[in-house]
Amino acid sequence: MSGRRRRLTESVSTRVGSYHVADAVALQREGAAMVVGIDILLTWNGSLPFSLGDLRFLHCVRSERRSCGKSLPGMNSSRVNMAETSGISAFTQFWGCIRLDGSCEVTRRPAMDLHGHHYREAYLQPAIMDGPCTGASSSARGRDGKKALIHRLLAALCPVRCPAKISGSSVRPMLAASRISGPVRSFIASCRRQDEQMNGRSQMRDCARRAFLPLRVSDARSEWICFIVAIW
């Protein structure tokens, strides 16, 4: 990690209790916008181990190209390098875009480990609702908490870079944890068992232990806000 990226990481990372809440790393300029990595830890039962208010420190990095663009780039090898600076191990990743009119588009991308190796297609399941982004709950627990987390992540960015019309209630992406497939649940369970055998605790140190949400930030004049969501 370069000195500049390390300084940024140190300046915006925070801890709440014993949980590492987020570690935002400014990555290389690639395509239309600067990519900002945000590493969020959630507990296994789906509850949030921190207050959503603790996400207020999130920062946008100004894009030089002033547009997120309307195409969804692939997960190439250079972008996978962000895994090495964030501690990600293996997650299913989804590119998604949210338009100002509230509609959503989602494209599945291969899940990768920190070396860029692909996991089975069976792990790739839609986790974001297509169509209108409505009905996000303000609850901070369980499935609704995950919807609210994505909602608040976008809302936290808006005062910095987004048009005023994108408010906390106007664009609400949905994260449907209930749609996570059986193979994914089995994968999670096997990781937990493996970790419990090694450590006597379910800490998931070596297998899918944290969620990584790198946000591709659009300019205020762009029609799009693009983001990636990683779900276990």
Curated annotation (Swiss-Prot):
EC number(s) given by UniProt: 1.1.-.-
Family: Belongs to the MQO family.
Induction: Expression is up-regulated in the presence of large amounts of glucose and during nitrogen starvation, conditions highly conducive to elsinochrome accumulation.
Protein name: Oxidoreductase 1
Required cofactor names: FAD
Keyword annotations from UniProtKB, A to Z: FAD, Flavoprotein, Oxidoreductase
Organism taxonomic ancestry: Eukaryota, Fungi, Dikarya, Ascomycota, Pezizomycotina
Disulfide linkage: none
Described function: Oxidoreductase; part of the gene cluster that mediates the biosynthesis of elsinochromes, pigments consisting of at least four interconvertible tautomers (A, B, C and D) that have a core phenolic quinone to which various side chains are attached and which play an important role in fungal pathogenesis. The non-reducing polyketide synthase PKS1 was proposed to iteratively catalyze decarboxylation between acetyl-CoA and malonyl-CoA subunits for polyketide chain elongation.
